[in-house]
């Protein structure tokens, strides 16, 4: 294990549940995190912000929080700002990194300005003329395309569009989840990868091979036929360089401590970054535990490592 005296952490709240579209995933993550911390002797307790006011954290003597909330206020900077206000240390990124990390539109703007490669894209606003915008977008980006709400995680409401006729309906559907919709050129030929980040751990890249069209919500949390390849099959030098770019993609957004950066490779091996995740899933289907396990780090040791990052200044 980490060698850290569990008493150093004090009373720890595991935040999970919440009110976002990812509540069920968060409940699963949180229960496992809670057990992992308790297995290490840490004084950890469950806390669902959908059921209790955050002020109770201070009132009940919590000094630290493991954030296992996904999406919504748990990942967009709001919970982070509240924890800052109450003087409670917490896992993951602060207000800025969390807010930017959940906002795919502004993430891509920052990446464009800082040289992090990301797929070409267009934005559509809720209420636009979807048919007219679809015609323009197909002319600019071609097909196939990915349509995504700007601020949902876990691939909620992400659609792959293969024909121009299907695009207006996909825009309309995505716009029910967010007022800004991202339409992104599909990067084909090299596969999907993720880089897991946890402090100074050198975690391997994971290649993701879903049984379906792409790595959607079902493939992430329900299906058992998604393949996770560790090692990922890339040459060591290329993997090292991709991990360096992934860390930069994370850092330029103001993200800190731990998370994930997802990217695609084209047929020539060029990387295009899709998004970061500042509060990754920690279910038995989730990627950080898989990456850690591949280098001999068990679940409990991983969550203690993540929590230990809150001990740093």
UniProtKB/Swiss-Prot annotation:
Pfam families hit by this protein: Dala_Dala_lig_C, Dala_Dala_lig_N
Residues annotated to bind Mg(2+) 2: 275, 277
Assigned EC number: 6.3.2.4
Binding, Mg(2+) 1: 262, 275
UniProt entry keywords in alphabetical sequence: ATP-binding, Cell shape, Cell wall biogenesis/degradation, Cytoplasm, Ligase, Magnesium, Manganese, Metal-binding, Nucleotide-binding, Peptidoglycan synthesis
Cell compartments where the protein resides: Cytoplasm
GO function terms (MF aspect): ATP binding; D-alanine-D-alanine ligase activity; metal ion binding
Cofactor note: Binds 2 magnesium or manganese ions per subunit.
GO biological process assignments: cell wall organization; peptidoglycan biosynthetic process; regulation of cell shape
Pathway membership: Cell wall biogenesis; peptidoglycan biosynthesis
Protein's UniProt keywords contain Lipoprotein: no
Matches recorded under InterPro entries: ATP-grasp, ATP_grasp_subdomain_1, D-Ala_lig_Van_CS, D_ala_D_ala, Dala_Dala_lig_C, Dala_Dala_lig_N, PreATP-grasp_dom_sf
Annotated ranges, domain ATP-grasp: 108-308
PANTHER family tied to this protein: D-ALANINE--D-ALANINE LIGASE, D-ALANINE--D-ALANINE LIGASE B
NCBIfam families cross-referenced by the UniProt entry: D_ala_D_alaTIGR, PRK01372.1
Family: Belongs to the D-alanine--D-alanine ligase family.
Name of the protein described by the UniProt record: D-alanine--D-alanine ligase
Protein species of origin: Burkholderia ambifaria (strain MC40-6)
Gene: ddl
């Amino acid at each position: 294990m980490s060698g850290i005296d569990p008493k150093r952490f004090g009373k720890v709240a595991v935040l999970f549940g919440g009110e976002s579209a990812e509540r069920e995933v968060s409940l699963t993550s949180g229960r496992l995190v809670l057990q992992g911390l308790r297995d290490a002797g840490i004084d950890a307790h469950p806390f669902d912000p959908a059921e209790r006011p955050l002020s109770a954290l201070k009132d009940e003597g919590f000094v630290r929080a493991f954030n296992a909330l996904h999406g919504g206020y748990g990942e967009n900077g709001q919970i982070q700002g509240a924890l800052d206000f109450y003087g409670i240390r917490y896992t993951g990124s602060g207000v800025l990194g969390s807010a930017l990390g959940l906002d795919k539109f502004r993430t891509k703007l920052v990446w464009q300005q800082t040289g992090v490669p990301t797929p070409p894209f267009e934005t559509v606003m809720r209420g636009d003329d979807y048919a007219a915008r679809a015609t323009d977008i197909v002319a600019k980006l071609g097909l196939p395309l990915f349509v995504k709400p700007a601020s949902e995680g876990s691939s909620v409401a992400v659609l792959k569009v293969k024909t121009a006729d299907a695009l207006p309906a996909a825009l309309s559907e995505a716009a029910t989840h967010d007022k800004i919709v991202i339409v992104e050129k599909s990067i084909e030929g090299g596969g999907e990868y993720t880089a897991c980040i946890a402090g100074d751990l050198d975690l391997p890249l994971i290649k993701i091979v879903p049984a379906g069209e792409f790595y959607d919500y079902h493939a992430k949390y329900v299906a058992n036929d998604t393949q996770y390849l560790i090692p990922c099959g890339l040459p060591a030098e290329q993997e090292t360089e991709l991990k360096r770019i992934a860390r930069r993609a994370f850092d330029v957004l103001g993200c800190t401590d731990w998370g994930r950066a997802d990217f695609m490779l084209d047929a020539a091996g060029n990387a295009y970054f899709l998004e970061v995740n500042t509060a990754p899933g920690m279910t038995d289907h989730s990627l950080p535990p898989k990456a850690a396990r591949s280098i001999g780090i068990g679940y409990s040791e991983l969550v203690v490592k993540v929590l230990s990052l809150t001990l740093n200044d």
